[in-house]
């Protein structure tokens, strides 16, 4: 079968922690494929694509030598790892997001979908061990943020920027240091936490609850100290998350925004005009921090590291949000390093000085490359 005749593409995107050594024989079974691929690897994102086999290494696509597959073969492989409920959603919606675990191998987050060539899927491995904030080389202010008794902490960035990994590390820090009740609401569950000093309950959309809003509404009666909302997708979920933060809970959430000011705007903009002033007031009182991040290839090419824009909601920031002067937040970021704040450009400069990324990589991602000095 020629590559151009291929009826489907199966892609596998994984986050790993040491270079893998591929087994010489990979069968036409997704379980065999995943089991024959060691997960003990260096930090990076990998992807495998069939019909035109490729693998993504730290953001770069590379071809690999794997057999081509028909649309029927790909479809059978994809549905073989679904349960009945996931298979039903896939058949009805033509796409589904879920996770599953191969014992003694890894957990995988899967997005199955359909294309003009037929069924397709993307698999991403979820490390069995949650990395610590130190292992992620996260700024020390992250620990202080995680120690907040209440408020809203938003981790934002584009898809694949490591938001889930950062949140998992912060939840793990709380779990290791505080006697707290931590409740997570995810779609799907990615990192599996074991209770340590804290009690952790993890709920998955469509498995343990019908919606984020339902789970958040119930959470207020489940006596949590910390609530993780996997995605803040709609006004109802965002409103309930703000209420939870206002009523004394520490709420973690994610948004696909780039930058603190854009994050504040996004939250306010999802509400009708008549509610925006009230939402700004709630956000000004409940916001603790906004962490916006991106991943960059390390200087040695053997991994990736995150750069962060960090906004701490001090009185000046709260006042700007309340008075709808969001554009002035960037000025506060530039002068707020004493309290742990930093702009993305300041973070990039720091990573260059630490020898973690190349100056050229920093300049490509900088908002104002001309002002950067190393």
Swiss-Prot record:
Any Pfam family: T2SSE
Location relative to the cell: Cytoplasm
Superkingdom of the organism of origin: Bacteria
InterPro entries from the UniProt entry: AAA+_ATPase, P-loop_NTPase, PilT/PilU, T2SS/T4SS_dom, T4SS_GSP_E_ATPase
SMART domains associated with the record: AAA
Binding site for ATP: 157-164
Keyword flag rRNA-binding: no
Any GO CC annotation of this UniProt entry: cytoplasm
Keyword Endoplasmic reticulum: no
Primary subcellular site in the record, as a coarse category: cytoplasm
GO molecular function: ATP binding; ATP hydrolysis activity
Keywords: ATP-binding, Cytoplasm, Fimbrium biogenesis, Nucleotide-binding, Transport
Entry similarity comment: Belongs to the GSP E family.
Role description: May be involved in pilus retraction.
Protein name: Twitching motility protein
Gene source species: Neisseria gonorrhoeae
Encoding gene per record: pilT
